[in-house]
Amino acid sequence: MKILSVLLLALIICSIVGWSEAQFTNVSCTTSKECWSVCQRLHNTSRGKCMNKKCRCYS
């Protein structure tokens, strides 16, 4: 039971820290496809996602 609580705590800490290294932009979008060129231009990566009508780039 102790191990389970330690694992749960570790999972929560990892979720809070946000190790995804996402970079937010102020560019409006409706689909993730629109973010690919924006992320390439701004952050030199083609991995982007449209979240809450804003582009979010991942490194």
UniProtKB/Swiss-Prot annotation:
Matches recorded under InterPro entries: Scorpion_toxin-like_sf (IPR036574), Scorpion_toxinS_K_inh (IPR001947)
Tissue and organ distribution: Expressed by the venom gland.
Record localization: Secreted
UniProt-annotated stretches for the region Interaction with Ca(2+)-activated K(+) channels: 48-55
Pfam family, one: Toxin_2
Main location: secreted
This protein's GO CC annotations: extracellular region
Site (Basic residue of the functional dyad): 49
Residues annotated as signal peptide: 1-22
GO molecular function: ion channel inhibitor activity; potassium channel regulator activity; toxin activity
A biological process term (GO) from this entry: defense response to bacterium
Protein keywords: Antibiotic, Antimicrobial, Calcium-activated potassium channel impairing toxin, Disulfide bond, Fungicide, Ion channel impairing toxin, Neurotoxin, Potassium channel impairing toxin, Pyrrolidone carboxylic acid, Secreted, Signal, Toxin, Voltage-gated potassium channel impairing toxin
Superkingdom assignment: Eukaryota
Pyrrolidone carboxylic acid modification, residue list: 23
Residues flagged as site, Aromatic residue of the functional dyad: 58
Family (UniProt): Belongs to the short scorpion toxin superfamily. Potassium channel inhibitor family. Alpha-KTx 01 subfamily.
Domain notes per entry: Has the structural arrangement of an alpha-helix connected to a beta-sheet by disulfide bonds (CSalpha/beta).
Function: This toxin inhibits numerous potassium channels: shaker (Ki=227 nM), Kv1.2/KCNA2 (nanomolar range), Kv1.3/KCNA3 (nanomolar range), Kv1.5/KCNA5 (Kd>100 nM), Kv1.6/KCNA6 (Ki=22 nM), KCa1.1/KCNMA1 (IC(50)=5.9 nM). It blocks channel activity by a simple bimolecular inhibition process. It also shows a weak interaction with nicotinic acetylcholine receptors (nAChR), suggesting it may weakly inhibit it. It also exhibits pH-specific antimicrobial activities against bacteria (B.subtilis, E.coli and S.aureus) and the fungus C.albicans.
Protein name per UniProt: Potassium channel toxin alpha-KTx 1.1
